Design a protein with these regions (language model features):
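Extracytoplasmic low-complexity, Pro/Thr/Ser/Ala/Gly-rich segments
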Residues: 1-35, 169-175, 179
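Intrinsically disordered, low-complexity Pro/Gly/Ser/Thr-rich segments with frequent PxxP/GP/PP motifs
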Residues: 3-22, 102-131, 135, 203
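An N-terminus-focused feature that recognizes amino-terminal "leader" regions
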Residues: 17-23, 32-38, 44-45, 59-66, ...
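Predominantly extracellular/luminal regions of secreted and cell-surface proteins
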Residues: 32-40, 131-156
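Conserved functional hotspot residues at active sites or interaction interfaces
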Residues: 42-80, 145-193
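Intrinsically disordered, low-complexity linker/loop segments enriched in Gly/Pro
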Residues: 64-74, 86-114, 122, 128, ...
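Transmembrane beta-barrel architecture of outer membranes
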Residues: 76, 105-109, 119-121, 133-135, ...
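Short acidic, flexible loop segments centered on an aromatic residue
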Residues: 81-103, 140-141, 189-203
Length: 203
């Protein structure tokens, strides 16, 4: 579909109940303002994942990195890796925790096999338990993959919500975090490949 105004937007929606989906866009023309974008959203009114989770869709890459909240009691972190190609691939996982320097020795192994057109889920809480925060690196040698981290928070039997974390592959010397209001309780997670001094300010 082609449009010549800001209101000319084509939208498609559908249910995804049995695994990841691949979107492929082929534009008949490439002019300023054309393109495609996708997002995913899930919601539930009861159960362990009660609430709303949303994220932009992920572009397959050979390497993807995540900075996520930890694996203390009540927090479940699931790494979901999808392989859109026509051949299986092996994916290497490295995880750093908040307690010490260097990558952690994982309790569940550090390699995932993802079948062609399939997805594989790794329980990060089982692989690196009792951590205040995790930095996760996902690497595929030959085939680009798409990955997200699905977080579920529980307080005993009470659901505290769920969320998706998408890859954050860019490091910077200056970052700004929006979306906080006066009185909010917030935790800041930082990762550096080398020793560094960090200055945090609020405005």
């Amino acid at each position: 579909q082609r449009g010549d105004s800001d209101d000319a937007v084509f939208m498609a929606a559908g249910n995804v109940d049995d695994g990841s989906r691949l979107q492929e866009s082929r534009l008949s023309s490439a002019v300023d303002g054309t393109g495609s974008a996708s997002s995913v959203m899930s919601w539930a009114t009861k159960g362990d994942v009660k609430g709303v989770s949303a994220a932009s869709c992920v572009t397959p890459e050979l390497e993807q990195r995540f900075l996520v909240s930890g694996t203390k009691t009540g927090m479940t972190q699931q790494l979901v890796v999808a392989n859109p190609s026509t051949k299986a691939t092996s994916v290497d996982i490295k995880i750093w925790g908040a307690g010490k320097s260097g990558a952690l020795a994982l309790s569940t192994g550090a390699t995932l096999v993802v079948g062609a057109g399939k997805e594989t889920v790794m329980n990060l809480a089982a692989a690196a338990s009792d951590q205040d925060a995790l930095y996760v690196a996902v690497s595929s040698d030959d085939t680009p993959v798409a990955a997200v981290v699905r977080t579920v928070a529980m307080d005993g039997l009470t659901s505290k919500g769920s969320e998706y974390t998408v890859p954050n592959n860019t490091m910077s010397t200056t970052l700004a975090v929006a979306g906080l209001s006066a009185g909010d309780s917030a935790s800041l997670y930082l990762f550096s490949k080398a020793d560094a001094e960090i200055t945090v300010s609020w405005t």
